[in-house]
């Protein structure tokens, strides 16, 4: 167990706001689109592997209290392959309209919203299935909550045994 908690959380759950309010939070969620852009599938896999290795080193370093990372299923697969211990925050599918509204309010284009949620809805179910039996703990976020609201519950699970380590 590490002092740094990795949190993978869906779009529109309040990651950026949480990171801006806390100096000990590193938000790396936006990097995945930048590191994969224009690469072949093989090169993407290599980049994902390297990126997750870096995340693992950052987690072990203890420099940050929380590191926020993507829920892209390609990355989740690599989190599992590299045996990361972490939290993943996903919305209830029936609440998805709330996240569409949040995306509009924060200024995302209709094209972005449509593309994201067409993929996102499919990925939620895929990710839930992928993480069963792994070191990844699932937290469901309700339509009235933001990531910040789940932090006490995440801390209870990931920080509970630090006193005994």
Feature names for model-found ranges:
Residues 3-7, 63-69, 86:
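Generic beta-sheet signal
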Residues 3-22:
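Glycine-rich phosphate-binding P-loop
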Residues 8-10, 69-73, 91-92, 141-144:
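Structural motif
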Residues 23-82:
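Conserved nucleotide-sensing/catalytic segment adjacent to the nucleotide-binding pocket
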Residues 25-27, 86-88, 135-140:
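Conserved beta-strand scaffold positions in the cores of enzyme catalytic domains, especially
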Residues 35-39, 95-104, 149-151:
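Short, charged, surface-exposed secondary-structure boundary motifs
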Residues 68-71, 82-102:
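Conserved phosphate-donor/acceptor-positioning beta-strand/loop module used by diverse small-molecule
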Residues 108-165:
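Small-molecule kinase domains that catalyze NTP-dependent phosphoryl transfer to phosphate-bearing small molecules
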């Amino acid at each position: 167990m590490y002092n740094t908690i990795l949190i993978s959380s869906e779009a529109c759950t309040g990651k950026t706001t949480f990171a801006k309010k806390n100096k000990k939070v590193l938000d790396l969620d936006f990097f995945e689109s930048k590191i994969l852009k224009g690469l072949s599938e093989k090169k993407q896999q290599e980049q994902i592997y390297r990126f997750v290795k870096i995340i693992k080193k950052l987690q072990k370093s203890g420099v940050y209290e929380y590191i926020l990372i993507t829920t892209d299923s390609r990355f989740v697969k690599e989190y599992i392959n590299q045996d990361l211990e972490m939290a993943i925050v996903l919305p209830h599918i029936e609440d998805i309209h709330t996240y569409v509204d949040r995306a509009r309010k924060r200024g995302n284009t209709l094209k972005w919203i449509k593309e994201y949620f067409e993929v996102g809805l499919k990925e939620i179910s895929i990710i839930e299935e992928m993480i069963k039996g792994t070191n990844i703990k699932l937290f469901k976020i309700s339509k009235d909550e933001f990531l910040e609201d789940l932090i006490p519950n995440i801390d209870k699970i990931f920080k509970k045994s630090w006193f005994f380590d």
